[in-house]
Structures are given as structure tokens and as C-alpha cells.
Regions:
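Catalytic glycan-binding domains that act on GlcNAc-containing polysaccharides
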Residues: 1-155
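Low-complexity, Gly/Ser/Thr/Pro-rich intrinsically disordered linker/tail segments
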Residues: 153-166
Length: 166
């Protein structure tokens, strides 16, 4: 995962710890994560709350926009490399559209959850639970940044080096 995350950092200018923290919050790093099924009368399934899917929990419409803009026609939401590239694109676009620093995990998460328009309108301000979740994402991002700083030199060497000398 480090190599894919490093490529995203280099391509989109996004620090590794921000999309990783958002991804943990959205899917707990599960490749096939989906929103829970909704039930009628407690036992009749009638679909999911949204089309979110995969590592990034990207909704179909937003994923399709990414595929077109980033020329990633073979990308898949359940592929880690593709999902983290999507997140890099999204975070980069959030900075461009809403002026949120790529390093600001708290407000990047609010952008990610509410969408660019929702963030711009301040829809999150009426959702105390979401602001609390964004604080958790920010705290986790800081933890991830510290962890990465302590081991990134080893990660850069690759798995074979770590196997024999790590």
C-alpha cells in the first residue's frame, strides 16, 4: 500500500496520511465495503442508503467523474491503488474548489463526506456527529503521519530489503 500511496502523493501533492485516515473512516480498509442494507418492516430488504462502494466509499456519480477527468477508464473502486488515486484526485479538487489545504484532514473529510457543494454551503455545521467524526479523522491522520515518519525510510527500500535486512 505504501507504494500506491507514495504515487498519489507525487501525482496529486496529497500527504499520505490524509487519504489513509479518510479511507480508514470510510471503509476500515475493506475492499468491498458498502453502506448497510435498508430494511422495510425489519425484514424486507429494499436497497442501500447510497451507491458508495469499495475502499474509498466513492459514490458512482463521483467515481464516474473521476474516471473521466483522470483518464482512469479501467479503474475499480475495490482496487486499493485505484481507490487511493481517486482520493488524491478528490482531495486535490477540494483544495481547488473550496480552498481547503491538502494537509487539513479535518476539513478535507468534511468535503469528502458532504461533497464540494455541501461543504461550500456549510451543511456539516448542522451535524455535530459529523464534526466529531472529522475530529477523529484529523487525530488519526496525525497519528498516521507520526508513524509514517518513523518508518518511511524502511518502506522506501521495498519489501525485499525489509525481508533480508529489516
Amino acid at each position: 500500500w505504501y507504494d500506491a500511496a507514495a504515487k498519489v502523493r507525487d501525482k496529486w501533492g496529497v500527504p499520505i496520511h490524509v487519504p489513509m485516515s479518510i479511507m480508514y473512516q470510510e471503509s476500515s480498509f475493506k475492499h468491498n465495503a458498502r453502506p448497510p442494507m435498508r430494511w422495510f418492516l425489519g425484514f424486507i430488504p429494499y436497497g442501500r442508503a447510497s451507491s458508495a462502494y469499495g475502499y474509498s466509499q466513492a459514490k458512482t456519480v463521483t467515481w464516474d467523474e473521476y474516471v473521466k477527468e483522470a483518464d482512469r477508464f479501467w479503474a475499480s473502486r475495490d482496487n486499493f491503488d485505484d481507490a487511493i488515486d481517486f482520493m488524491g484526485w478528490y482531495i486535490s479538487k477540494s483544495q481547488r474548489l473550496n480552498g481547503v489545504s491538502k494537509w487539513d484532514a479535518h476539513n478535507q473529510y468534511l468535503n469528502y463526506h458532504e461533497g464540494w457543494g455541501g461543504y461550500k454551503r456549510g451543511s456539516y455545521k448542522k451535524k455535530a456527529w459529523l464534526v466529531q467524526t472529522a475530529k477523529k479523522v484529523d487525530s488519526r491522520a496525525k497519528t498516521y503521519a507520526a508513524q509514517l515518519k518513523s518508518c518511511e525510510d524502511d518502506l522506501k527500500r521495498g519489501w525485499l530489503w525489509r525481508l533480508f535486512f529489516g
